[in-house]
């Protein structure tokens, strides 16, 4: 069996990792062994935070809706309950947007939700 040195594949693999580590500080962008660890950890963080992002944004929307609903004299839970009873199906992302940018329309939604309770 002939000896296999894998020089080309190793160089390609190292280049790929170092390209992904571009912009990292110090040895993390220059030394393969350190860069590999940094890129691997970055991938783990990215994977985890793609899932966390959904939770964080939902929390933000709920906080904004709650604040706007309370300004109109209704708690978040009663507001959502009223919307469901009035069969108004607007998701929390859009409700939060309306609460921030169109206070008149949000006040109308609160009135409808209050009437349905």
From Swiss-Prot:
It comes from Aliivibrio salmonicida (strain LFI1238) (Vibrio salmonicida (strain LFI1238)). This is Large ribosomal subunit protein bL20. The keyword Repeat does not apply. NCBIfam families: rplT_bact (TIGR01032). GO terms for biological process: ribosomal large subunit assembly; translation. InterPro entries: Ribosomal_bL20 (IPR005813), RIBOSOMAL_L20_CS (IPR049946), Ribosomal_protein_bL20_C (IPR035566). One of its GO terms (molecular function) is rRNA binding. It holds the Pfam family Ribosomal_L20. The keyword Ribonucleoprotein applies. Binds directly to 23S ribosomal RNA and is necessary for the in vitro assembly process of the 50S ribosomal subunit. It is not involved in the protein synthesizing functions of that subunit. Belongs to the bacterial ribosomal protein bL20 family. Keywords: Ribonucleoprotein, Ribosomal protein, RNA-binding, rRNA-binding. GO terms for cellular component: ribonucleoprotein complex; ribosome.
């Amino acid at each position: 069996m002939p000896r296999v040195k894998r020089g080309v594949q190793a160089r390609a693999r190292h280049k790929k990792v170092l390209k992904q580590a571009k912009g990292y500080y110090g040895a993390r962008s220059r030394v393969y062994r350190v860069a590999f660890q940094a890129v691997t950890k970055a991938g783990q963080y990215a994977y985890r935070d793609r899932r966390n992002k959904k939770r964080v944004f939902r929390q933000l929307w709920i906080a904004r809706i709650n604040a706007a609903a309370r300004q109109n004299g209704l708690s978040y839970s009663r507001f959502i309950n009223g919307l469901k009873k009035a069969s108004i199906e607007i998701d929390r992302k859009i409700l939060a947007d309306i609460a921030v940018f169109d206070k008149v329309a949000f006040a109308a939604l609160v009135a409808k939700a209050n009437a349905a309770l």
